[in-house]
Amino acid sequence: MLTAIIDYESGNLHSAEKAFQRMARETGAGEVVVTSDADLVARADRLVLPGDGAFPACAAELRGHKGLYDAMVEAVEQKGRPFLGICVGMQLMATTGHEYEETPGLGWVAGDVVRITPENAALKVPHMGWNDLVIEAAHPIFDGIAGGDHVYFVHSYHFRVTNPTERLAHVDYGGPVTAVVGRDTMVGLQFHPEKSQAIGLRMIGNFLTWTP
């Protein structure tokens, strides 16, 4: 089994690579590679799309790596490969992003990415630090995870999901902020699992052993 972490020049992937490789060893999930090789992405059994920075910049970088982008889309849309989006990689699953300008996303989960606007003016943006998960729907990504378990966030924009059944978990930050989305063979995490200690590692392991 091969898991490809897609490298499209959007952030340092070292900590994510180490976390995924550790959990692949612990779960017997095979090999994990960081790659910008379209052929390797096409052959991978599951895909991970990270992302740090602004939505339009990440979208442009991803689409700018055309062979890589096409291989990823074909693997997910036509071959049904399990897919995990992390942070901006999760946001790119949306229909549209509204950071600085309107930017089309992948359109895999209907909704848009908008600035966080806490009802409590004392809450600062970006939303940075630990927050407690409110799980809204059962999903294999939550195996061994309980409501109230905390994970680590750093973001100023969040995914406003159109279909409530595709928002799998949220956190409270002056109102609900989407934490996990998913449908079919796709799941996305707004938080950084590689920075979320035991809970994040457990979710990485859950993805690596998920057979949708």
Swiss-Prot record:
It comes from Ruegeria pomeroyi (strain ATCC 700808 / DSM 15171 / DSS-3). GO terms for cellular component: cytoplasm. GO terms for biological process: L-histidine biosynthetic process. This is Imidazole glycerol phosphate synthase subunit HisH. Its main location: cytoplasm. NCBIfam families: IMP_synth_hisH. Residues 2-212 form the Glutamine amidotransferase type-1 domain. The active site is at residues 87, 192, 194. It comes from the Bacteria. Pathway: Amino-acid biosynthesis; L-histidine biosynthesis; L-histidine from 5-phospho-alpha-D-ribose 1-diphosphate: step 5/9. GO terms for molecular function: glutaminase activity; imidazoleglycerol-phosphate synthase activity; lyase activity. Heterodimer of HisH and HisF. It is found in: Cytoplasm. Keywords: Amino-acid biosynthesis, Cytoplasm, Glutamine amidotransferase, Histidine biosynthesis, Hydrolase, Lyase. InterPro entries: Class_I_gatase-like, GATASE, Imidazole-glycPsynth_HisH.
